């Protein structure tokens, strides 16, 4: 699998994510499965935050209590999302090409995304919060650093929030507000020049969330909700570039 290369399905086949808008074929989505399949000391290298500071190149991520890692969850869910979008005629690219090696730093991922001039950028993650905390939250850059972050990115976050909730995935009860969280510390969002969100799909330390994440059926449920959110946003963006 080649990182950053646009891929589209040869024969569009509508996935289980039904009622998807029909005018999104040819649009471009950059998918960032958060974290790396492997890590070493290089992930501590300092890179720009997009707000004048620096932060680590990458974080190692979290895991469920049984040891299922965040990086594998985001990878497997990201592949499902990619397949569903390709089946709808959407062109996609991934930030990393495998789940067993070092991946690009957070600023490099943002630069890769911006270079594609995508209609949407979605970064997939899972939180490591308190065991009592359950549910997803959708992050966006705040305060915004450009007009895209101020408008379309927030719209994207709200549409994704609504579709996740409509799919039966609960909003976070321990962080953010009403399933949304405006943040200034996420480099990928700060550096984005195109509509961009980071979705924490659930809390890996919560028994109910982790059970969903650890099952293939659960990952498909997340992917189906994600494709509805992405497609719903794309439908508001006019024609493909």
From Swiss-Prot:
One MF annotation (Gene Ontology) recorded for this entry: N-acetylmuramoyl-L-alanine amidase activity
Description of how activity is regulated: The structure reveals a short flexible hairpin turn that partially occludes the active site and may be involved in autoregulation.
Pathways involved: Cell wall degradation; peptidoglycan degradation
Sequence ranges assigned to domain MurNAc-LAA in this UniProt record: 29-230
Note: Disulfide oxidation is not required for folding of the enzyme core or in vitro muramyl dipeptide hydrolysis.
Disulfide bonds: 57-105
Biased composition (Polar residues): 55-67
Annotated spans, Disordered: 45-69
Protein name: N-acetylmuramoyl-L-alanine amidase Rv3717
GO cellular component, one term: outer membrane-bounded periplasmic space
Similarity comment: Belongs to the N-acetylmuramoyl-L-alanine amidase 3 family.
Its job: Cell-wall hydrolase that hydrolyzes the amide bond between N-acetylmuramic acid and L-alanine in cell-wall glycopeptides. Is able to hydrolyze the cell walls of several bacterial species (i.e. Paenibacillus sp., B.avium, E.coli DH5alpha, E.aerogenes, L.acidophilus, B.thuringiensis, B.pumilus, B.subtilis and E.coli W3110), thereby showing that it is a cell-wall hydrolase with broad-spectrum activity. May have a role in peptidoglycan fragment recycling.
The protein's Enzyme Commission number: 3.5.1.28
Compartments, record wording: Periplasm
Pfam families: Amidase_3 (PF01520)
GO biological process: cell wall macromolecule catabolic process; cell wall organization; FtsZ-dependent cytokinesis; peptidoglycan catabolic process
NCBIfam families assigned to the protein according to its UniProt record, in alphabetical order: amidase_Rv3717
Enzyme category, top tier: hydrolase
